[in-house]
């Protein structure tokens, strides 16, 4: 993957404008700032649209004996990947996120739910029933970070240096930046946008690999430690 200045040079060539000597520090250069702005928007839109493998992360935390888990949401959290929350101490799946109605029903109920469930509210992670301290919860999530610095040590929410490397495909970023640039300038951008959407669709098909589906709806890898559950409907013979 290329750094943002290298990408900007390719973008400028496609747009038939002067290659920028820099991006972040060139605050008086309209073209450089426009490229930087549209590249940033493209990255953020891509992160919002799909769970790209490059921006998937794992978070683990240790429970406290309270509903609100103070370390339940990591820095840079954007959204959780569904059905990935597990209690590694009890070896059980953590249900959720449950609805606000279900959460309030649990709080008002005289009975205590047997299995862990969670809800996210106000940027915080809550568990019900209240867990004991010291259990390990883990889940997968999508990060808000769109790039990493030139030393590959610090992730970025926005571009701060020309040597930073975005987490997304070079050609996809070039196409996304070009069509946004053309649109902002009031010129035709339909062809570039179509090419962008087609490449994005192709990359989604290839991203992270794909598992083999069984015709019976099951999986050869079904070894998840799901807890036993009482059936919703009892059948008497």
Report residues per predicted region.
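Glycine-enriched, solvent-exposed interface loops adjoining structured elements
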Residues: 1-237
């Amino acid at each position: 993957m290329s750094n943002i200045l290298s990408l900007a040079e390719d973008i400028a060539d496609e747009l038939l404008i002067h290659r920028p000597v820099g991006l972040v520090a060139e605050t008086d250069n309209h073209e450089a700032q426009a490229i930087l702005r549209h590249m940033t928007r493209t990255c953020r839109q891509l992160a919002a649209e799909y769970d790209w493998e490059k921006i998937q992360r794992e978070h683990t935390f240790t429970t406290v004996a309270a509903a609100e888990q103070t370390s339940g949401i990591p820095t840079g959290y954007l959204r959780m990947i569904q059905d990935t929350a597990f209690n590694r101490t009890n070896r059980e799946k953590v249900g959720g996120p449950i609805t606000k109605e279900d959460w309030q029903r649990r709080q008002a109920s005289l009975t205590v739910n047997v299995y862990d469930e969670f809800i996210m509210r106000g940027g915080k992670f809550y568990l019900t029933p209240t867990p004991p301290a010291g259990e390990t919860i883990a889940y997968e999530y999508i990060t808000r970070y769109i790039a990493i610095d030139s030393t590959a040590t610090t992730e970025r929410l926005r571009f701060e240096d020309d040597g930073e490397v975005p987490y997304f495909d070079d050609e996809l970023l070039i196409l996304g930046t070009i069509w946004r640039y053309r649109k902002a300038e009031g010129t035709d951008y339909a062809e570039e946008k179509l090419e962008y959407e087609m490449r994005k669709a192709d990359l989604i098909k290839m991203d992270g690999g794909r598992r083999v589906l069984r015709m019976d709806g099951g999986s050869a890898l079904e070894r998840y430690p799901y807890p036993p559950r009482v059936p919703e409907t009892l059948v008497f013979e």
